Swiss-Prot record:
One of the Pfam families matching this protein, by short name: Herpes_UL79
A GO CC annotation given for this chain: host cell viral assembly compartment
Organism: Human cytomegalovirus (strain Merlin)
UniProt-annotated stretches for the region Disordered: 243-273
Record-given protein name: Protein UL79
4Fe-4S recorded as keyword: no
Record key words, sorted: Host nucleus
Amino acid sequence: MMARDEENPAVPRVRTGKFSFTCANHLILQISEKMSRGQPLSSLRLEELKIVRLICVLLFHRGLETLLLRETMNNLGVSDHAVLSRKTPQPYWPHLYRELRQAFPGLDFEAAVFDETRAARLSQRLCHPRLSGGLLTRFVQRHTGLPVVFPEDLARNGNILFSLGTLYGHRLFRLAAFFTRHWGAEAYEPLIRIICQKMWYFYLIGTGKMRITPDAFDIQRSRHETGIFTFIMEDYRTFAGTLSRHPHRPHPQQQQHHHPGPPHPPLSHPASSCLSPEAVLAARALHMPTLANDV
């Protein structure tokens, strides 16, 4: 599913913006148009909604694997605990302790930690690929809802628990937990919608289904402040004729007599007054490494 088709001449492409060409697949073009316009997820058909969610889950899955691999490579040959735990948030350790208690229900951890012989025996047991791999999978699934199965080579590494702690404190880890926990909740729909937008366009560009011209990155870097994905979406809407520089704002008296449904905040203001206080707090927690367990 992640195979690139950028260099495949048999894949027809259509211009979808001044800086973008997209493969001429009707379903992809239809979803891209809805994503670029920021339509509520409820406006997508069931087939489209399943595809968007599957892509988001797939990208979270691959992203967590890549991050854990990166941290494992960074920790190779390091034996200083102060260095290994430099990027590990404090709330990670109580969660890891509870996970270890469930993995070894009959083990006295207090005695094992302060006794060198028992500690060495416990370390040998943790180095077993099946045991450590299961520990990693359960920990990630418990906190993100994603059943990520990591390769045995990662699980066999002696510093894997420190690498897992760095992964736990990463923003992508919290974003995955936020996405899986609040998917389908109406109060969080505007925030989930923004995540789906970014993930969708990242998927199209990463797999070669959307080709971006090189000058787009130069223009975006000097004239745009909200990122390449928002830049491409605005270009997409401008090309399709759906981008308004001056969005219509009804008069307050008109707003009192017109309530077609639950309001949705603008794309550029996800934490507006349309969101519930709980949704705003959850969104702010995504930027706080010490609150990863609250997401």
